[in-house]
Design a protein with these regions (language model features):
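N-terminal, positively charged nucleic-acid-binding surface of large information/translation enzymes
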Residues: 3-238
Length: 239
């Protein structure tokens, strides 16, 4: 390397700004559903990256200024559906809360074995975290309602006439209507390969409860008016 090249490299290195770090930081890792044990994909695909970042920031800005949190997601149709199937087969006895508590404990044990440095691994539907989630969710919805950011919409939803119950996304199984899709399972509005569609387009739908074709009924729910925030979100992304 010539003297000119060395001098140019030195000059370039002087112009590189040091990274700026926040005074405090909250690091989060995706919350696994409370119906399964953690596997290598969870650890390597979610927690290791967040753990490395949390450890790095603790070294830079001090451990007291970094909080690394995650937890068990206690809500969702996969949990309720798996719980129902196990109870019907006689493979689990207890409440759905006890079912989730069982897997929450197993998940925490696995994370401890891998030495993932979480400050808190909670559970959205258990203990004090359950109370906090309820309070925060209520406050969030009431604030949106007060500022007219919610609207009522009527949509079609699957209904099992034999069990007299509305079916959630995982309680309906059929074939994906997207052309060329090779998925072996299509659920209410999304197949196992991630294609999304309207529930009415699902081919040959069957209720996992009765095994029969469910009816379609109109259901009215509150929806967040995301369109109102299009410009604001665009500005935020540009920043």
């Amino acid at each position: 390397m010539s003297n000119n090249e060395i001098n140019n490299n030195i000059s370039m290195s002087k112009n590189i700004e040091r990274p700026k770090f926040p005074k405090r930081a909250v690091i989060t890792a995706g919350m696994p559903y409370g119906n399964k044990e953690l596997h290598l994909g969870h650890i390597g695909g979610v927690f290791v990256h967040a753990d490395a970042f949390a450890r790095f920031l603790r070294d830079r800005i001090g451990k007291d200024n970094v909080i690394f949190v995650s937890g068990t997601d206690c809500y969702g149709s996969p949990i309720s559906e798996n719980y129902r199937q196990l109870v019907e087969k006689g493979e689990f006895k207890g409440t759905i809360e006890e079912y989730v508590q069982h897997y929450h404990k197993l998940q925490k044990e696995v994370l401890d074995k891998y030495n993932i440095s979480l400050n808190l691994f909670g559970a959205s539907g258990l203990g004090r975290a359950k109370e906090i989630h309820r309070e925060m969710s209520l406050d969030f919805i009431e604030t949106l309602y007060k500022h007219n950011h919610l609207k009522k919409l009527t949509t079609s939803q699957f209904y099992d006439t034999e069990y007299d119950v509305l079916l959630n996304g995982r309680q309906v199984v059929g074939r994906c209507p997207i052309a060329g899709c090779s998925s072996d399972k299509g659920y209410a509005d999304e197949c196992s390969l991630g294609h999304q569609y309207m529930p009415s387009d699902l081919i040959d739908p069957k209720s996992t409860l009765s095994g029969k074709k469910p009816a379609m009924v109109d259901v009215t729910n509150w929806y967040f008016n995301l369109d109102e925030f299009h410009d604001l979100l665009g500005q935020w992304v540009e920043q």
